[in-house]
Regions:
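N-terminal export signals
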Residues: 2-4, 10-32
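C-terminal segment of N-terminal export signals and the immediately downstream linker at the start
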Residues: 5, 26-83
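Flavin (FAD/FMN)-binding glycine-rich loop and adjacent Rossmann-like elements that form
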Residues: 41-44, 49, 69, 75-80, ...
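Beta1/beta-strand and adjacent pyrophosphate-binding region of the FAD-binding site
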Residues: 84-95
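Loop/turn elements at helix/coil->beta-strand transitions in domains of secreted/extracellular proteins
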Residues: 87-88, 108-111, 198-200, 234-235, ...
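N-terminal Rossmann-fold NAD(P) dinucleotide-binding loop
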Residues: 98
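Conserved beta-strand-loop-beta-strand element in the redox core of flavoprotein oxidoreductases
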Residues: 212-231
Length: 472
């Protein structure tokens, strides 16, 4: 058949997707407006046996140069930005914290938008191939463990287990509440959970770069995409960027620290080695005990050097170095009996930046308080312990409120903690805990017409408890 015009239904039928895709209503179309594609031609390409949809796209106001040279300096004049979207709450960053914040906000009744720079949710959990969900529980008398990161985090883990996306073990190093989860399964599950919320709009491939500010109050965010720079207006903003990017742009004070820049490599054909061969080579960086969500695959987590996780040159050097080290490991393994077929399946698309900015908030949680398990009247959740040797500790709501800035909350690894506490709050489940609290608070405060700082924390705690969160 030569090139021909086809209806959308015919196009889907030829792909074998007709009934499913049309019934779902979201396989094709503009996710921002939820409108169908405009009339146009689906062109069959006989060279590849596929179809392409071709239509003209009108230019946008942002499709113009915005910087110029003058007197040897690069200048960027003020210009009007298109308003892409409006919401009650906008969450910037779709990692574990942003995922939970957006869900919590939408479920609390607020019209919510989630802006994420990559094409999937999960952040370092999925795009960074971190996999293992640690810090979910605390050790209790008798050697048992108590799950403390419930709420949205608990829901996510239960659903991941039900869909067969996780490996659960009961040994002392992992326990029944610290699964290793397939990153692709996690992406799909997160997609399903956010797409089920009518109050939630997700915008991928959009990088939050600035804030819309009115004095000390935040009125929205500015994001960059292939369509140019645009704005989303909102009553409340939740910074889940991990680096406190939004709070930084809003002028919040912060402390910047260095940490290891990690890198994860996924290797294949490991399953051909015998358990004895794996055990014998464990000291050389080879896999020890099979604990992977995909049979025959092995995830190598490189700790990486200390570095500035915001510095472009350092990040670039780390990317080069990690990939080279990964390939050298493969070469070493291929020269070892049982590992001859080893190959690189995947490398993380997101470098393992563990900590950068710690935002100055209304309260800073220190190590002494975490060790003493200090009780706070405004506790919004708990952090577990990945070793099960220490008890869980409370996280106060005030650690989510950037000092001197209104209408903004922060969640994830940039909350107000001392540097020596960061390794206990940057964990995947704890980020979900602070994200859920921040999203709930943002929605409640927007509905009540008060700032997050003026929100009745007792009402917030009641709502979190009603939703399954563990507060003590």
């Amino acid at each position: 058949m030569s090139m021909l015009q086809m209806t959308k239904r015919e196009f889907l039928r030829r792909l074998g997707l007709g009934g499913v895709a049309l019934a779902g209503g979201a396989a094709f179309g503009d996710e921002a407006t939820r409108e169908p594609l405009p009339p146009g031609d689906y062109i069959a390409d006989p060279r590849y046996g596929t179809c392409r949809y071709i239509r003209d796209i009108p230019k946008m106001p942002t499709d113009v140069p915005s910087a110029f040279l003058k007197g040897g300096k690069v200048l960027q004049p003020a210009r009007e930005l298109p308003v892409f979207h409006e919401a009650d709450v906008v969450v910037v960053g779709g990692g574990p914290a942003g995922f939970a914040a957006a869900l919590a906000s939408a479920r609390t009744g607020a019209k919510t938008a989630l802006v994420e720079r990559y094409g999937s949710l999960g952040g370092l959990f999925t795009n960074g191939l971190v996999l293992i969900v640690i810090g979910t529980a605390e050790g209790v008398r008798g050697g048992a463990q108590r799950l403390v990161t419930r709420g949205i985090c608990g829901e996510f883990m239960e659903r991941a287990k039900a869909m067969g996306a996780g490996v659960y073990r009961t040994d002392r190093h992992h326990g029944p509440h610290q699964p290793t989860i397939d990153p692709e399964g996690a992406k799909v599950l997160m997609d399903r959970m956010v797409r089920a919320e009518q109050n939630l709009d997700v915008f991928f491939h959009a990088w939050g770069v600035d804030v819309v500010q009115d004095g000390a109050e935040i009125r929205g965010v500015v994001f960059e995409s292939k369509q140019g720079r645009q704005a989303i207006l909102a009553k409340r903003v939740v910074d889940c960027t991990g680096d406190g990017d939004v709070a930084f742009q809003a002028g919040a004070d912060f402390r910047q620290i260095t940490h290891n820049l990690g890198f994860v490599t996924q290797l294949g054909s490991i399953g051909r080695a015998t358990p004895e061969q794996m055990s014998a080579k464990a000291a050389d960086g080879f896999p020890k005990v099979p604990n992977e969500p995909i049979p025959g695959a092995f995830w190598r987590n490189w700790l990486g050097p200390q570095g500035n996780g915001l510095a472009v040159r350092e990040l670039t050097a780390a990317e080069f170095g990690h990939r080279e080290a990964s390939w050298r490991l493969v070469e070493k393994m291929r020269a070892t009996p049982g590992f001859e077929s080893t190959y690189v399946m995947n490398t993380c698309s997101q470098l393992g930046v563990r900590a950068t900015r710690l935002i100055k908030t209304d309260y800073t949680l220190d190590m002494g308080e975490t060790n003493a398990q200090t009780v706070f009247d405004d506790a919004i959740g708990l952090s577990g312990d990945d070793t099960f040797t220490r008890g869980a500790f409370q996280i106060p709501y005030r650690t989510l409120l950037p000092s001197g800035v209104e209408n903004l909350l922060v969640a994830g690894r940039a909350i107000g903690v001392a540097p020596n506490v960061i390794d206990r709050v940057r964990l995947i489940p704890v980020c979900m805990v602070t994200g859920e609290a921040a999203g709930t608070a943002a929605a409640l405060s927007a509905t009540a017409g008060v700032t997050p700082r003026a929100l009745d924390v007792r009402a917030l705690r009641r709502r979190l408890a009603d939703n399954g969160a563990c507060l003590a």
